Amino acid sequence: MSVSETRDLFDRWELVWHEDRHDLVPACVGPTYVRHEAAGERTVTGESYAAELARMKEARPGVRVAVYDHVFWDNRAWFRFTFNWRDPETGKPRTQAGMQSYRIEDGKLAETWIVLQPEGSAWPDAVAQERWTSPPPYKR
């Protein structure tokens, strides 16, 4: 898979997350999507994961994913990010830092490994990328 194709996939995936474009889930997630998480490994479908995202967004209103670094190579992608949202009861800002890598198959997400820091964590970067696939805001 080319870097351009991978970038296009994650541009669509960002629309799913930030613009609630759940109609794009079938273009982003394969027939099965294996997720390796702190609670263990599980396999979901695009449809079930879209429903899960909707529930998560209810629990974390206005959630945004600020990406600080990413790498695309072959059929893999890696991101360093922070979830940002407001506590639904207090309205106070909440954060949670994490890293996630993906395996892509037939142009769609097939498998992911995600590691999250505790709630309240955030990366020390002053500025995030403009979009998930934009160049980092610092010179290499």
Language-model-detected regions and their locations in the chain:
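A short gly/proline-enriched turn/hairpin at secondary-structure junctions
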Residues: 32-44, 56-59
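Short, low-complexity N-terminal intrinsically disordered segments enriched in polar/charged residues
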Residues: 1-32, 43, 130-140
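Short, hydrophobic secondary-structure boundary micro-motifs
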Residues: 25-27, 36-37, 65-66, 112
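A beta-strand edge to alpha-helix "cap/lid" segment located at domain peripheries
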Residues: 5, 9, 50-140
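Hydrophobic small-molecule pocket/channel-lining residues, especially in calycin-type beta-barrels
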Residues: 47
